[in-house]
Amino acid sequence: NFLGRDLNTLTEFSEKFRKETGLKFVLSGTNPASIEEEKMEVLIRGGLVRIKMGFESGSDDVLKLFKRPVRTKQLRRAAETLSKFRGKMVAPAFEMIVDNPFESNEDLYRTIEFLDDIPGPFTVSMFSLQFMPGTALTEEVDDFKTVEEHIDKEYMFSYKPTAINLFVSIFAIIKPSHFLVKLIRRMIAGREDNCYPLIKNILYKL
C-alpha cells in the first residue's frame, strides 16, 4: 500500500519522480483507509493520474467476512476525498467482488445503495469471487461443489449473468441518477431471477 507511507516520504518521492522522469503514474492495490487529502495533493503534483482500490462490497457484513481492514464508513470517506480531485486526475476505479455464495441479495442491494450514495466521478470494476485452496474463506465453505465451481475460473469478465450483477455493472459505465437506481430496484425486487433480460435492455440503452 504505497499511500501508507508518511507525508514526508511521499513528498520526497513525488518531487524526485517528477524532476527525474516527468512521467505520469497510477496506484493500484491502495488501502482506502490511507486516502488523505494532503497525500493526494502531493502525489498529484508528482504525476499521479489515477487510483485503483478494492472496495469489495458496500455491505459491512461482507467486508467483515472478507476480513477487510475497513468498513463502509472508511470507504465512503475515501470516495469523498477522491471526489475533491475531479478534473485533476482520471476517475478512480473501485473494485467490487460478486458471485459470493455468502452474500444475500440484501447485501448486494446495500452495495448498490452505497455506490449510489457516494460522490463521483468513479468507475467500477467487477470481479467474480474465486476460492483459493487453503485460504480461510475456502475453509468456511461446507459445500465442495460450491468451491469447485469457483476454483480456476476466470475471475474477470465472467461474473454470473444475474439481474443484480448487471445492476451493479451499470456503475462501470455511468453513475446513474438516484431516481433510476430506485426505479430499477423497485422493478426487480423479489423477481431477481426473472429480470436479467430487463436489466440487460436498460444497460444497452444507457
Enumerate the predicted regions with their spans.
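Conserved SAM/AdoMet-binding glycine-rich loop
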Residues: 1-93, 98-100
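C-terminal accessory regions of radical SAM enzymes
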Residues: 91, 106-206
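Catalytic palm subdomain of template-directed nucleic-acid polymerases
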Residues: 103
